[in-house]
Amino acid sequence: MKRFVDRIIIHCTATRADVDYTLENVNRDHQAAFGKNCQYHVFIRKDGTIHRANDFNVVTWHTGGINNRQGIGICYEGGIMAKGNPANPKDAIDTRTPQQKESLIVAIKEAMAWAGGTVKAIKGHRDTSPDKNGNGTIEPAEWVKMCPCFDAIPEYKHLLQ
């Protein structure tokens, strides 16, 4: 049975732009953290190479709760400035290459096609943070993390229309 998917969550690896971080690195780090290989469905390298790490029908642990059950996780390599420190939020920036930007759109469209018209939201991991003040908007002060280091909601809004 095909699972219901209504959201796509965009992630970054929170790794420095000047350091290569491969799918093998993701697998190693996710094995250590979760006891399983890559918990994203799609992983995109700096050169734009798209890796299908998991079948879209598999629930993976990329965000939390309903975002995992009803979401597809797409991750790009990067998110931290060259020579930056992943522990410093000021070093979290949009490091996407032109190739990654193109591949992200390809991967999102592929995920949407697989879902069969049920996707209603494309957002960043940070946009799944709790709305602590209850105003209906996840604001920067409420972000649990900076990921994906750019504002995914307006970036991909046109894909939902």
What do these predicted ranges mean?
Residues 52-64, 131-140:
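Charged, often glycine-rich, active-site loop that binds/positions anionic groups
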